[in-house]
From Swiss-Prot:
Protein known as: Tyrosine recombinase XerD-like
Function: Putative tyrosine recombinase. Not involved in the cutting and rejoining of the recombining DNA molecules on dif(SL) site.
CC per GO annotation: cytoplasm
Domain of life: Bacteria
CDD domains the UniProt entry points to: INT_StrepXerD_C_like (cd01190)
Keyword Nuclease: no
Primary residence: cytoplasm
Domain Core-binding (CB): 8-81
Domain Tyr recombinase residues, every copy: 93-253
Amino acid sequence: MTISSFQKQLTTQITNFLARKTISDSSKQAYAYDLKQFVNCLPGRVDQTSLKLYENQLKEWKPSVQKRKRSAVNQFLLYLYQKGELEEFFKLSETAPLPSQQEELEIFDLSSLYEGQEGPGKLACLFILELGLLPSEILELKWEDIDLDFGVVTVAKGSTKRVLRLDGALKELLFGIKNDNSQGLILSKAFTRQWLYKQIQSYVGGCGLSGVTAQALRQQYILRQIEKGTGAFELARLLGLKSPVTLEKYYKT
């Protein structure tokens, strides 16, 4: 059996395996994602050698992610054995190794961003830090996209829309600047991205954080969501991404 046909056969088994599980669609997506990664690592067979190769690749991930992937793979291996697809029962070690000493991305103290003077720079910073929005998305936001009573923001990106939870300091700031005449764009009129980047740069500089960029703020949003326990698929949805592939580096050790 060729590697491609072997992987195709196991991919079919993944579908059958997940069909037996009474779990949410998002959990099934996570299982499918982890198991397809596992199958793609196999050199045309399941044995101790191929499992060792896979376990070596797992070392790149954080212990919490390793634990999730190990659990999913072990359940799948047991399923294959019980179905008679494997003549021998294989199992990955349940214990993840200690995290490496590699430099990790850090969550910064950005409390000063909440204390600065109100204006477009502060508003943009909080939209990025609390909701992970892109500057281009902020520029297109309209008051009609925001429901302060229900605490939600609807963000349109192409033909898709996502609804994000709005609370904390950003919600308070929007309450403070909204009035009976508030309509149209949040920033009152159309501006360029270059203009908004300058507003952000000026504001963070005034808060003593001159090295912090819009990209860094979005990265901080990602790290804070991961710290809360947000999974890769849910985080991708919050950010408006089509897949969690670009987020994998944040879930690695």
